[in-house]
Swiss-Prot record:
Provenance organism: Picrophilus torridus (strain ATCC 700027 / DSM 9790 / JCM 10055 / NBRC 100828 / KAW 2/3)
Protein name: Tryptophan synthase beta chain
Gene: trpB
GO terms, molecular function: L-serine hydro-lyase (adding indole, L-tryptophan-forming) activity; pyridoxal phosphate binding; tryptophan synthase activity
Gene3D superfamilies on file: 3.40.50.1100
Cofactor: pyridoxal 5'-phosphate
Top-level lineage group: Archaea
Family that this chain belongs to: Belongs to the TrpB family.
Keyword flag Amino-acid biosynthesis: yes
Length: 419
């Protein structure tokens, strides 16, 4: 192993602090709002979130010290993750510049999700919670929550969106191996789930419904709710991705001109792209969503509910509406109606550009990446790669350096190619 390669994977690459984008936004982040006169969703957060997570959600501090115990856990689960030059992809595309990718699929659970799951489970443990609960789409977040809970000897209850529960049975196996209880959502475990099922016994589920069920369960069982995405604390914890990428690129004597990431709620994208913002005002940034969930092109930038039941506060974001039921698409992690307020604000200001790609483009991108670089990537990550491939073909003679965040591997998502 070369010294350069060893340096790129040294534990010294892991940052000492999380980065919070709030102080560097072009305008103050609009605060969350209560939507009911007889019930405070904002006060509810005090009951379901670990106090330290809630503090990080509303802080204006640019940096937050990462506890040593969390850094130790980061090392245990595979951080820092590799940053690799995609030379074969460059050759295949006849691209005149360089293409790099950050591979979050190298973590223990195969995606970026574990970065914030470990932090939130650590804070829940410190509060002597009975356990943790959350929703999951494709199962990556559920797997990360299950592992993080296991590492801190906490119980975990996962509400998995029904369509993904049926499409991705091996994700259930992973969560069960980590001693988690997993049910399809909507479920009979909660009053809200039972209400949805009474109206439509075959409801495919949505992330918004899963959130509502998990919050209800947390209140009833003295569990802490684990925030998968959208909320600023989750994006802050994910900033290890971007900060590692910056250090690794510097070690290679490189710096990207263009960044690419996929967006469900925005956590992997924000964690990857946001740390670059204060460093370079000219860097181009592309956020890719599924064409079937066109939140940035057809959604409104407005105050809207984060969950279907309206238990959580409303936030200002790009949204297709909290009652939007996405098609049963191949990328369960992108079936969310909204996007993180910080990301939405930056897109509204034009600082970050958005793109939408089709299922065919995503499948072609996954196949191309597999046959050039060898990695079978997650369908969600395939969206970012599809946009990067499109960009490289349209700008092949500009010799720009491209950096893609590959948020996870796709080894448990192969059913999309079995049709």
């Amino acid at each position: 192993m070369s010294e350069e390669f060893k340096s790129l994977l040294s534990s010294d690459i892991i940052p000492e602090n999380w980065y919070n984008v709030t102080p560097d936004l072009p305008e103050p982040l609009p605060p969350p709002r209560d939507t009911k006169s007889d019930f405070s969703s904002i006060n509810l957060l005090n009951k379901i979130l670990p106090k330290e997570v809630l503090k990080q959600e509303f802080t204006f501090k640019r940096y937050e010290k990462i506890p040593d115990e969390i850094i130790d856990k980061y090392i245990q689960i595979g951080r820092p993750t590799p940053l690799i030059r995609a030379k074969n992809l460059e050759k295949y595309l006849d691209y005149g510049g360089k293409i790099f990718f950050k591979f979050e699929g190298a973590t223990a659970t195969g995606s970026h999700k574990i970065n914030t799951a470990i932090a939130q489970a650590y804070y829940a443990m410190n509060e002597n919670a009975n356990g943790v609960t959350t929703e999951t789409g494709a199962g990556q977040w559920g797997s990360a929550t299950a592992l993080a809970a296991s590492l801190y000897n906490l119980k975990s209850q996962i509400f998995m969106v029904r369509v993904s529960y049926e499409q991705k049975p091996l994700r259930k196996v992973v969560m069960s191996l980590y001693n988690s209880s997993v049910v399809p959502s909507p479920s009979n475990l909660t009053e809200f789930g039972r209400k949805i099922l009474s109206e439509n016994p075959d409801h495919p589920g949505t992330l918004g419904i899963g959130i509502s069920e998990a919050v209800e369960y947390a209140l009833d069982h003295n569990y802490r709710y684990m925030v998968a995405s959208v909320m600023n604390a989750a994006l802050t914890h994910q900033s290890v991705i971007g900060q590692e990428s910056i250090k690794q690129m510097e070690l290679l004597g490189e710096f990207p001109d263009v960044l690419f990431g996929c967006v469900g709620g925005g956590s992997n994208f924000g964690g990857f792209a946001f740390p670059f913002l204060p460093i370079n005002d000219d860097i181009e940034i592309y956020a890719t969503t599924a064409q079937e969930v066109p939140k940035f092109s057809q959604g409104e930038y407005k105050y809207d509910l984060m969950d279907t039941a309206g238990v959580l506060p409303a936030v200002r974001m790009y949204s297709l509406g909290a009652d939007f039921v996405p098609p049963k698409i191949y990328a369960g992690g992108l079936r969310y109606h909204g996007a993180a307020p910080s990301l939405s604000l930056l897109i509204n200001h034009g600082r970050i550009k958005s793109d939408e790609v089709t299922e065919e483009q995503v499948k072609n991108a996954i196949k191309t990446f597999a046959n050039t670089q060898g990695f079978i990537i997650a369908p969600e990550s395939g969206h970012a790669v599809a946009t990067a491939i499109k960009y490289a073909r349209e700008h092949k003679d500009e010799k720009k350096t491209l950096l893609i965040n590959v948020s996870g591997h796709g080894l448990l998502d192969l059913s999309i190619f079995s049709d």
